[in-house]
């Protein structure tokens, strides 16, 4: 533990790490012209025949700081990113600080159940899964044995298919999430969650 001179902050651990992850795939029937398998992008008529692809852009680096202050108690600061941005540039995946069961920053959304997601080779993940990240302020209550309750306020992000008449507008309110989870061992749990959100859009009607 390294304490800063003249302050009440004690740094217990800090480090930088990461991993290299590479995948290879062979498409026998020209399903999708993308390194990720996105079912919505499958064309009605195949445009591509056999093709081989490799990708290492999901390699990840992270920075982590663990410490203690009288005001915040034990705290953790964590940032991580990979190279899935445009043209394989760096893309932020997590950037948050947690203390006294409060999390502030950019991390996994409160409506998703991260522990229920299966491991997949494809970076896109399982089809139909609820997976997203959001800038948020969240609180987790752990005062009851085997139970965990969480509530969060999140920055809204709406993604959808648009057209010349339909556009996604600026959102007017944050998203609100809440969840309750019961665990009876290290690998089994039941979780109930809900979300309140407003999705604002504009629609231009053409009169003939």
Q: What function would you assign to each model-found segment?
A:
Residues 1-6, 11, 206-207:
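Single conserved hydrophobic/aromatic residue that forms the stacking wall/gate
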Residues 4, 16, 191:
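Short glycine/serine/threonine-biased micro-segments
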Residues 13-36, 44-158, 172-187:
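Outer membrane beta-barrel
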Residues 162-205:
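Surface-exposed beta-loop-beta
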């Amino acid at each position: 533990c390294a304490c800063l001179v003249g302050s009440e902050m004690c740094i217990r651990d800090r480090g930088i790490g990461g991993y290299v992850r590479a995948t290879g795939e062979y498409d026998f029937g020209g399903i999708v012209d993308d390194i990720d398998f996105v079912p919505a992008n499958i064309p009605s008529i195949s445009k591509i025949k056999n093709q081989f692809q490799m990708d290492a852009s999901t390699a990840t680096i992270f920075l982590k700081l663990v410490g203690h202050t009288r005001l915040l108690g034990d705290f953790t600061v964590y940032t991580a990113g990979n190279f899935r941005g445009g043209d394989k540039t760096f893309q932020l995946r997590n950037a948050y600080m947690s203390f006294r069961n409060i999390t502030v920053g950019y991390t996994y959304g409160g409506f998703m159940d991260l522990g229920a997601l299966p491991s997949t080779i494809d970076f896109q993940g399982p089809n139909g899964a609820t997976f997203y990240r959001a800038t948020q302020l969240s609180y987790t209550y752990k005062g009851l044995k085997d139970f965990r309750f969480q509530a969060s306020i999140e920055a809204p992000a709406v993604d959808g298919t648009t057209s010349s008449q339909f556009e996604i507008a600026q959102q007017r309110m944050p998203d609100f999430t809440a969840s309750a989870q019961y665990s009876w061992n290290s690998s089994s749990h039941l979780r109930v969650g809900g979300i309140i959100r407003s999705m604002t859009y504009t629609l231009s009607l053409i009169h003939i």
